[in-house]
Amino acid sequence: MKTTPFTETHIALGAKMHEFAGYNMPIEYSGIIDEHLTVCNAVGVFDVSHMGEFWVKGPNALEFLQQVTSNNVATLPVGKAQYTCFPNEEGGIVDDLLVYHYESEKYLLVVNAANIEKDWNWCVSHNTVGAELENASDRMAQLAIQGPKAMEVLQKLTPVNLSEIPYYAFTTGEFAGQKDVIISNTGYTGAGGFELYFYPEAGQAIWKAIFEAGAPEGIKPIGLGARDTLRLEMGFCLYGNDLSDTTSPLEAGLGWITKFVEGKNFTSRALLEKQKAEGLKRKLIAFEMVDRGIPRHGYELVNADGEKIGEVTSGTMSPMRKIGIGMGYVQTAYTALGTEIFIDVRGRKLKAVVVKAPFRK
């Protein structure tokens, strides 16, 4: 199994470790609910060094990104980040990712850990314009410091004025005595905070500084278990669950990152435009349980007559709401807010209702 600069630290802190995307990663420390509430109410630190990072450089960088991503990179100014996806030839999704406009003719792509090899091969094979590509995944580490007290803690460690970095913006500066740290106002929790990118050898110094600075605020290390419950409470999609090679961005509710603008001929554009014009047969919905029960990935969604109408893609017990919540694809007829649907849990029909995400207001 691969390791991150923090693997030994997680083990020393008593984390429950598990293989994820080929890495030995912490799933939980004090428990998922405690960690979830820590991030919502205070501040927590996630090791996300398993994520992939690709540099796209040169005079043809923008043209390349306009061909392989769904969002309009031409409108992305230097210093800002953009959520997007790689559509495949069949109208499905290769991966969802962040694009950072680092400097003129230089972009950073941050991709999902489980898809690094697939995404890299996709980019290389679709680089028909001669953009300069570099896979820096093994040369970059990443920590996400999330929660309402994140800025307060991090500001103690950098001369950069963090309050001047808007949401989905970033800067590169000194942090905890380390140079060239990318400080990004982004996250996957909905609780606010920052994501830091840095050289792996700076990892231990940065980790130590953050935990010393955050002690008065009750800072804790957080595992991937709570990362999943936090993102689900926000209705954020997870690749491999809610997004896949066979789900279209339009079905997934990602029409807002799918830009059919002039001069942007991304993979399967015509197919997705046709899908939009003809109407969708299924859509991703958010739902909360009316009956007691926890929906799980792969459970069938049925109507009142017990006929299959879709499938749960993500589900959990919401630590904040203390009810079962989930997402799943259903036939379009069942997507209106307030629609009653049922989860087939081992032959029992449990009632749920279609709601608007996020679940955590």
Swiss-Prot record:
Its EC number is 2.1.2.10. GO terms for cellular component: cytosol; glycine cleavage complex. GO terms for biological process: glycine decarboxylation via glycine cleavage system. Pfam families: GCV_T, GCV_T_C. GO terms for molecular function: aminomethyltransferase activity; transaminase activity. InterPro entries: GCS_T (IPR006223), GCS_T_bac (IPR022903), GCST_C (IPR013977), GCV_T_N (IPR006222), GcvT/YgfZ/DmdA (IPR028896), GcvT/YgfZ_C (IPR029043), TrmE/GcvT_dom1 (IPR027266). Keywords: Aminotransferase, Transferase. It catalyses: N(6)-[(R)-S(8)-aminomethyldihydrolipoyl]-L-lysyl-[protein] + (6S)-5,6,7,8-tetrahydrofolate = N(6)-[(R)-dihydrolipoyl]-L-lysyl-[protein] + (6R)-5,10-methylene-5,6,7,8-tetrahydrofolate + NH4(+). The keyword Transferase applies. PANTHER family: AMINOMETHYLTRANSFERASE, AMINOMETHYLTRANSFERASE, MITOCHONDRIAL. The glycine cleavage system catalyzes the degradation of glycine. Belongs to the GcvT family. The glycine cleavage system is composed of four proteins: P, T, L and H. This is Aminomethyltransferase. It comes from Phocaeicola vulgatus (strain ATCC 8482 / DSM 1447 / JCM 5826 / CCUG 4940 / NBRC 14291 / NCTC 11154) (Bacteroides vulgatus).
